[in-house]
A protein has these predicted regions:
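Alpha-helical tetratricopeptide repeat
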Residues: 26, 48, 52, 60-71, ...
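Alpha-helical repeat scaffolds
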Residues: 6-18, 38-53, 76-87, 111-122, ...
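A C-terminal functional module that forms or caps the active site or interfaces directly
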Residues: 97-100, 105
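Generic helix N-cap/helix-start motif at coil->alpha-helix transitions
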Residues: 19-28, 57-65, 91-98, 124-131
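Terminal, low-structured helical/coil segments at or just beyond the last alpha-helical repeat
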Residues: 53, 57-76, 112-143
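Residue-level signature for tetratricopeptide repeat
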Residues: 1, 30-33, 69-70, 102-103, ...
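Structural motif corresponding to the intra-repeat A-B loop/turn of tetratricopeptide repeats
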Residues: 5, 35-37, 71-74, 107, ...
Length: 143
């Protein structure tokens, strides 16, 4: 929420001591990236190592988070899209849909988001942020 509303300083204050849990460390790292914090590179490397270790164990439970990390922090949209689509096969919540849509936009592969678009239509989900992403994906809005 705070990152979506461009409030990274608040994220830094809230999460600076919460680096053991990967999802919290990701949000801290995203805030550090936005603010240029001197701990950004350290936390970026820590997350990269944790995600690599999880993949070596065959653990795919955090692919949605890893997708966001890969897209936003590592700036690798193609790889982020692969992770998001793989995650979508197992988990279908709005945040998982967001990962696919954001990665598909960044990778310039709107066709990869078709399963999410179908799901949104089938479920009738109403989410302003997902609708905004769909508009960008389909050429009906600017990001």
């Amino acid at each position: 929420f705070l990152l979506d509303y461009n409030r990274p300083q608040e994220v830094l204050a809230l999460l600076k001591d919460w680096t053991r849990a990967d999802p919290l460390l990701l949000r801290l790292t995203l805030a550090e990236q936005l603010t240029g914090a001197n701990t950004f590179r350290e936390h970026q490397a820590a997350l990269a190592a944790r995600y690599a270790a999880a993949r070596m164990r065959g653990d795919t439970t955090h692919e949605q988070e890893e997708s966001r990390f890969t897209l936003v922090v590592m700036k690798q949209p193609e790889e982020a899209l692969k992770l998001a689509v793989s995650n979508w096969r197992l988990q279908r919540e709005p945040r998982d849909a967001r990962a696919v849509l954001e990665s598909a936009i960044a990778a310039k592969k709107p066709e990869a988001a078709k399963p999410v678009l179908d799901w949104m239509q089938q479920t009738g989900i109403e989410d302003w942020y997902l609708r905004k992403l769909v508009a960008v994906l389909t050429g009906g809005g600017a990001k």
